[in-house]
Amino acid sequence: MTLSAGGMVTSEYAKRYPIFTIEGGPISGIIGGIRLSSILGGKNIIVIDGGSTTTKAGLAKELTPKVYTEYWIEQDDWNAGYPLRVPTLDITEIGLGGTSLVWIDDAGNLRVGPQAAGARPGPACYGQGGDKPTLTDAYVLSGFLNPEYLLGGRLKVFKDLAHKAMSGIARQLNLDEKEASYGVVRLANDNAANLIRQISVKRGYDPREFTLIAHGGAGPMFAPFIAEELKIPEIVVPAIPSGVFNSWGMIGLDIRHELSLTDISSLKMDGAYAKYVGSRFEELESRVREMFKLEGVDPSSVVTERYLDIRYEGQAHTLKIPCYNGRLGIEHLKEAAEMFHKAHYKEYGFSLPESGMEIVGFHVVGIHKVKPPELSRISTTGSLNRASLGERTLFVDGSEFNVPIYKKESLPAGVVVEGPCIIEGDTATTVVTKNFKARHDDFGNIILTPNRR
């Protein structure tokens, strides 16, 4: 099972402490994005997982995600959310996905989500009894989704039911169904772009310095519009099928255990205090190694990491600062204090070097390395003509035009296609806008980069 902090534990441990596995699924996707990027030689990544009811995003600068000791469920710009004091990778989410309901609020504004039709009854076009319009219905009506090839043609889609469901929204907006549908698509793209702003710009990161890794059924459809809005220079749509990318991220995760201890004291620069801090870490390290031993892992194979939760005196919030992993001296406490000042400045825009500091807690992470799975290379044989599925009409910004459609599974390695076009896979559809070109790499990933004409 995946921990919210990004490691793996046995099912028995997860049964005893289920709270530590919250958000384990999408966090596996972030880890998968980190692993994929390391294979491709990437550096800074933002991972977006566009699903059925929610879209989640995480960020890893230098392929290292931040871990927070507090996680807020259902927190957004309008809701305070619910806090959980568990170590969690930095991840944020919104109620947006393929089954998000389309509606008009009391002020006459178009809305997409957070309510959703879910798997049952699902979008109206699925013919499972749903009669309310969803984002998927809008994709079908505006031409982005192929009603004949969803799930490789295994899922029948009824375009007439999508028309019927969207008609009420169109009437309220004084538009036809196609115009209303594209309005829904644009709003969904804007909401997804705002999610990426939350995980990047609001954290002090420039999205122009990152690669966007897009997975899930909706992720590759949001991605080019997000990249255009935020000037992200590269998009990677993983070769791993969208429905199992999180699972792929979980396979090969390091086994991980961690413990925290709250013990508030003023940070002092003297030898006795350094010895005291070291003893607290050693206590936690001993307990962490015992946890590995109970799971059949040789404690001598475990690598430990130390962190201090530090704050300025009089403050409520803390920052997690790495600490020297050995016998502590005054110089190591000074180093931690300097790192705290820098981290505080980056996080909040100011630091107080002359102010007193407090250590609020101690945190030890134990890691047993596991070899991750490798990616297989795909065939270089085949041709673009064999992958062609003809053309389809898109409705965008009030205009209709035809774009080429390609079958993802038939594209040979190394082929490059220019946008606008659509690449249809068995489990996901990748939209390539006119400002991008797409390369099918040696592993079967789709790499989108700006199309400089």
Task: Identify the meaning behind each predicted range.
Residues 42, 52, 60, 97, ...:
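C-terminal, non-catalytic interaction/recognition modules in large multi-subunit enzymes and RNPs
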Residues 7-45, 72-89, 99, 108, ...:
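Conserved phosphate-binding catalytic cores of ATP/NTP-utilizing and phosphoryl-transfer enzymes
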Residues 58-81, 235:
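Basic, amphipathic juxtamembrane/active-site segments
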Residues 61, 68, 86, 102-105:
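Conserved P-loop NTPase motor core
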Residues 49:
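Conserved catalytic-loop position in the HRD/HxD motif
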Residues 100, 130:
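OB-fold/S1-family RNA-binding modules
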